[in-house]
């Protein structure tokens, strides 16, 4: 039985947590992010559009180099990058394995039984056979950056073997610029598209699990069940009620990929127990997807990446009116470190930047 003093301490923590969440909610209601007028979006030079399209086509026309991405990452980061890392979870972790060392999203400590339950619902745990059969795969990771708008790269992006899209970034209405082919939609519950139109029957839905209720949500989506109301209370925004895909199209991202990205490659500090908030050590879904792509494909390209904070009035995304200045208010991610990482990959030739948001090569 717990001592009364410890019980009171736990009650106080819970009370303060609820109060803090309530305050943040009130602040959110009263805070309006500055909006950018998409109709007045900065002018896109037609010559630059042509150069971007030509460059992207040249990337595809060159002979694909087997294992190039993995080999390059291993040379660049040495022992900090594992060439043998599986991209998706295939079995529940044992206590002695790397997955059990950390809590989500860096591992599955104390969640082994939930992982096992999910895996039993998923008939497949790897890339589909038609993709595995390719001797050399080209990936493109499509970010949400406003820089994509106007480049008209859609047709070229559709020609990649594997097209990875992030969170709720839409295809409908933007296919001219971002294409309409999706191989992988990688996201967490709050980031999943709410519209059925953003899911195609052969997509892979790759779930990134951050917290306990994320497991409940994914189980409900796979089983096509309604998520209980009390579970919904633990999400910080509305989540999808249904994902119109068959169980064979769901995958669970290997959390060791997030751990490798955060602690080994970006060299963030490991998580520390804190009463409030969390360390700024969680990579963005975009950077995690780039590292995932190096494990999945032989060659990797990027499109729609890059934050130009010197242009605060330019659109942050290609699909909404949020300004670049909004990045100054986010506290979860270390944008500066991630930008340096992506720039290093582009400069060293590990990945190609098709839209020129990281380092223009055209």
From Swiss-Prot:
Record's catalysed reaction(s): a beta-D-Gal-(1->4)-beta-D-Glc-(1<->1)-Cer(d18:1(4E)) + CMP-N-acetyl-beta-neuraminate = a ganglioside GM3 (d18:1(4E)) + CMP + H(+); ganglioside GA2 (d18:1(4E)/18:0) + CMP-N-acetyl-beta-neuraminate = ganglioside GM2 (d18:1(4E)/18:0) + CMP + H(+); a beta-D-Gal-(1<->1')-ceramide + CMP-N-acetyl-beta-neuraminate = N-acetyl-alpha-neuraminosyl-(2->3)-beta-D-galactosyl-(1<->1')-ceramide + CMP + H(+); ganglioside GA1 (d18:1(4E)/18:0) + CMP-N-acetyl-beta-neuraminate = ganglioside GM1 (d18:1(4E)/18:0) + CMP + H(+)
GO molecular function: lactosylceramide alpha-2,3-sialyltransferase activity
Positions bearing carbohydrate: 30, 180, 224, 334
Keywords (A to Z) from UniProt: Disulfide bond, Glycoprotein, Glycosyltransferase, Golgi apparatus, Lipid metabolism, Membrane, Signal-anchor, Transferase, Transmembrane, Transmembrane helix
Spans within the Lumenal topological domain: 27-362
Record field: transmembrane: 6-26
Protein's GO biological process: lipid metabolic process; protein glycosylation
Entry keyword Transmembrane helix: yes
EC number: 2.4.3.9
Cell compartment(s), UniProt: Golgi apparatus membrane
Residues in the Cytoplasmic compartment per record: 1-5
Disulfide bonds: 139-297
Entries under CDD domains matching the protein: GT29_ST3GAL5
Family to which this protein belongs: Belongs to the glycosyltransferase 29 family.
Protein name, entry field: Lactosylceramide alpha-2,3-sialyltransferase
Biological source species: Pan troglodytes (Chimpanzee)
Source lineage: Eukaryota, Metazoa, Chordata, Craniata, Vertebrata
